[in-house]
């Protein structure tokens, strides 16, 4: 008998149009093996990753666009063990709504590890700059710039979550999953610049603002 693969429910949330479905579909096996749960209108993609401690799997719950019609039902969040909140760096309103998604998620799942992802960093007209991305620091989340269409930083959120869930900072991915070929290319120099800007921004004190709505 082969050992059971540790499997974790991951909820993927954020405004409609931020690239959540594009992101999850990059992982080809997960896309091939996805299942549709009609009762709550969700697609579940089983994303497997190979680590130096064996295989780990995330059952990624994708909302299939329901968030466009208001909030998601609690049934979507129940028993989630980790989460990714996504916004679009070309759309300020999607970042402004991040606290609402975070509130809904932690109301049902209190102390789960969560990664905040700013998607579409391949687009030149970036609106949400590093210095304005502070929510993750207030709430102790991890943050990554990503570009779903180019696969840039695709594995980063999953690796961070895997380490948290396994309680092992030494965990590494030893083989890359098969990903859909990039539809766009990122500018490597620009990505390095963004990373430096993020590091510099993280070193700054958090702005004094009214946290009542965050």
From Swiss-Prot:
Organism superkingdom: Eukaryota
SUPFAM superfamilies: P-loop containing nucleoside triphosphate hydrolases (SSF52540)
Positions annotated to bind GTP: 15-22, 65, 119-122, 147-149
Residue span, Small GTPase Ran-type domain: 4-168
Subunit structure comment from the entry: Found in a nuclear export complex with RanGTP, exportin and pre-miRNA.
Classification via NCBIfam families: small_GTP
Biological role: GTP-binding protein involved in nucleocytoplasmic transport. Required for the import of protein into the nucleus and also for RNA export. Involved in chromatin condensation and control of cell cycle.
Protein's recorded name: GTP-binding nuclear protein GSP1/Ran
Lineage: Eukaryota, Fungi, Dikarya, Ascomycota, Saccharomycotina
């Amino acid at each position: 008998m082969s050992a059971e693969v540790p499997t974790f429910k991951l909820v993927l949330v954020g405004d409609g149009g931020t690239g959540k479905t594009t992101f999850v579909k990059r992982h080809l096996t997960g896309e091939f093996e996805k299942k549709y749960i009609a009762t709550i209108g969700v697609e579940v993609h089983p994303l497997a990753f190979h680590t130096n401690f064996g295989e780990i799997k995330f059952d990624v719950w994708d909302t299939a666009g329901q968030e466009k019609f208001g909030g998601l039902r609690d049934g979507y969040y129940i028993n989630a063990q980790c989460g990714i909140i996504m916004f679009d760096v070309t759309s300020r309103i999607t970042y402004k709504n991040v606290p609402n998604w975070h509130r809904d998620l932690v109301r049902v799942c209190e102390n789960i590890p969560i990664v905040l992802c700013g998607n579409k960093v391949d687009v030149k007209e970036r609106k949400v700059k590093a210095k304005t991305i502070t929510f993750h620091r207030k709430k102790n989340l991890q943050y990554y710039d990503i570009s779903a269409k180019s696969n840039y930083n695709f594995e980063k959120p999953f690796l961070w979550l895997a380490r948290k869930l396994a309680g092992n900072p030494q965990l590494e991915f030893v083989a890359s999953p098969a990903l859909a070929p990039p539809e766009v290319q990122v500018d490597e120099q620009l990505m390095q610049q963004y990373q430096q800007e993020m590091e510099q921004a993280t070193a700054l004190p958090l702005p004094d603002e009214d946290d009542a709505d965050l």
